[in-house]
Amino acid sequence: MSKASREELETWVDRWLQANKDCEKAGDWRPLAAFYAQDATYGWNIGPKEDVMCVGVDEIRDIALGLEMEGLENWVYEYQKVLIDEKQGEIVGFWKQIVNKSDGTQDEIYGIGGSWFRLNADNVIEWQRDFFDFGHVAKMFATLIESGDLSTGMQKRIERSIAGEKLPGYYPLGQAPVPIW
């Protein structure tokens, strides 16, 4: 657990938020891997049947920040509020998922999304858990399919999933190598 002061954690958050903006602009989130410990875990629930869990910085870079972000190059995750708990070295950031559509307009996934982090003694992420409303995510992707705004990368991801391809990092509900909680 982090022993950082409130000021040090605020500086960490500022760096994290700027790195996210830089990655969104580049359409490549893999550089965020520099914020994670070698043995970090990063997971989230993907509806009533599956969890996603990446164990170790390589899986985090390649799966969570790589494969899972493919097709989202036209998306931004605007942090709306960040809460810092300096006693536990934990941070919660609440974000909106916003898509830039081909006609120049934007749309966003309804509901609350966010990331919950714990930093270790070296002030790198020990674990991260994301949360979002899967029903609203599915609805947005259906809307994007109907309007023709679903990116080619996301179309390929959906096709792989529909074809039954085993996606790396996906586990039956409650069977991930590290628990969500």
Predicted regions and their residues:
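Short acidic-aromatic low-complexity motifs
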Residues: 2-39, 70
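A beta-strand edge to alpha-helix "cap/lid" segment located at domain peripheries
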Residues: 3-4, 8, 68-181
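Short, mixed-charge, low-aromatic patches
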Residues: 13-24, 50-53, 70-74, 126, ...
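Charged, low-complexity, helix/coiled-coil-prone segments
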Residues: 1-13, 52-63
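A solvent-exposed, acidic/Ser-Thr-rich amphipathic alpha-helical stretch
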Residues: 29-91
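Residue-level detector of alpha-helix boundaries and kinks
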Residues: 5, 17, 45-49, 102
